[in-house]
Regions:
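Flavin (FAD/FMN)-binding glycine-rich loop and adjacent Rossmann-like elements that form
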Residues: 1, 14-15, 19-24, 91-98, ...
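Conserved N-terminal/central alpha/beta ligand/cofactor-binding core
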Residues: 1-72, 125-127
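Short, basic and Ser/Thr-rich N-terminal targeting/leader segments
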Residues: 66, 79, 216-218
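Short amphipathic beta-strand and strand-loop transition segments with alternating hydrophobic
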Residues: 71-75, 165-168
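Short beta-strand element of the conserved SAM-dependent methyltransferase core
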Residues: 73, 85, 130-134
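Conserved beta-strand-loop-beta-strand element in the redox core of flavoprotein oxidoreductases
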Residues: 74-93
């Protein structure tokens, strides 16, 4: 969301401006500046954000279909014509001129029969997050202390991941704990089983925190677990693939639609992850070509299912650039109309998303 350094400029605008302004006015945000990521991390009250999103959707007059599951997609050649959806209240058909694949797992692209990729070198691990309440903010261990203790005591407490952290939300007596690793397979029984495994891991982390840091966490309890956090599972084969070399070099593409300075953050082993932060003046970009399935005329992907290699995707699947990708996808489909997103005026698209690529105020 922000450039590197302790007070980097905001990189993503549009609805991001509205979220930061309105949640900030509610006291529902906390800005963590600097630290291991060398950037500004925005902590938020998850209830306040979810209600903001729901109200934004309602006020925009968007027709919603809650709890629907995609069962199939009907095609006419390179175009998706209609989606087959199931809800507990009955089946539904959804026809549209264009579609955004923001499913995370490229479900729309996959169900339509277009090419997709999966991690080639083993799984990318997900995380079961939890929010603790009743902590003592003044007695929190440092991140380095927590990691060293977790590594030393992992066998005793049955910890899988040893390099996690607990981010305190000042003034609320709460902490966001990110200290688990679970596989997130694309198979219904396995992913369901692993969701329970993730909570079991989180409970072991809580036991570790309460036992090893009783002054800080002794009176804490779980406020919420949330759904399993899925990082990288399956993504589109795009017109262009973003590479780790592009990320490290800060390649600015002629069709760039998003930017970020977030580190390479590849969770490719159970006990830890690759963490490669960048300098204060670093910036890397997401090309529109990586949002467009190479075989499709009316799909644009957004979020963690765009086309990138494992390491590149690990750096651009975070919230700031994902918001920018969503905006770019909507504008691209608007420009395409009943035509193909493969043939839109990229210069016109760049003008529409300029704030998310060029703005520096």
């Amino acid at each position: 969301m922000f450039a590197n350094g302790t007070h980097g400029v905001q990189l993503t605008h549009g609805i991001a401006d509205d979220i930061l302004r309105e949640l900030g006015a509610q006291g529902a945000l906390h800005y963590r500046r600097g630290g291991p990521s060398n950037t500004t991390v925005v902590m938020y009250d998850e209830i306040a954000l979810s209600r903001w999103v729901e109200e934004a959707v309602r006020n925009a007059g968007i027709t919603v279909l809650l709890g629907a599951v995609l069962r199939g997609a009907a095609r006419d050649g390179a175009r998706i014509r209609e989606l087959d959806l199931a809800t507990r209240y009955g089946d539904a058909k959804l026809a549209a001129t264009g579609f955004v694949d923001a499913t995370g797992d490229a479900v729309l692209t996959w169900e339509a029969g277009f090419a997709c990729r999966e991690p080639a070198d083993g799984p990318v691990y997900g995380t079961q997050m939890m929010v603790l309440e009743g902590i003592d903010e003044a007695r929190q261990p440092t991140r380095a202390e927590l990691t060293a203790r977790a590594r030393a005591k992992a066998a005793l407490y049955g910890l899988v991941r040893t390099d996690g952290f607990a981010f305190v939300f000042p003034g609320r007596g709460t902490a966001l704990v990110n200290h688990t690793h679970v596989e997130t397979p694309l198979e219904p029984v396995a992913v369901s089983s692993n969701a329970l495994l993730g909570k079991a891991q989180a409970d072991k982390v809580l036991h570790f925190l309460k036992s090893e840091y009783p002054d800080a966490f002794g009176q804490s309890r779980v406020r919420s677990y949330g759904l399993p956090g899925i990082r990288q599972t399956r993504w589109i084969v795009g017109r262009q693939q973003l590479t780790v070399e592009d990320v490290r070099a800060g390649t600015k593409f002629s069709d760039a639609v998003a930017r970020t300075a977030w580190p390479i953050e590849l969770h490719d082993r159970p006990d830890g992850y690759i963490w490669e932060p960048f300098s204060d003046n670093h910036m890397h970009y997401v090309p529109f070509g990586s949002l467009v399935p190479a075989e499709a005329d009316n799909i644009v992907a957004a979020g963690r299912c765009i086309d990138g290699d494992n390491a590149a995707l690990s750096s651009v699947r975070v919230m700031g650039p994902c918001i920018a990708m969503g905006a770019a996808a909507a504008h691209a489909l608007d420009l395409a109309g009943s035509g193909s997103v493969q043939q839109i005026d990229v210069a016109a698209l760049r003008r529409r998303v300029r704030d998310n690529v060029e703005r520096t105020d």
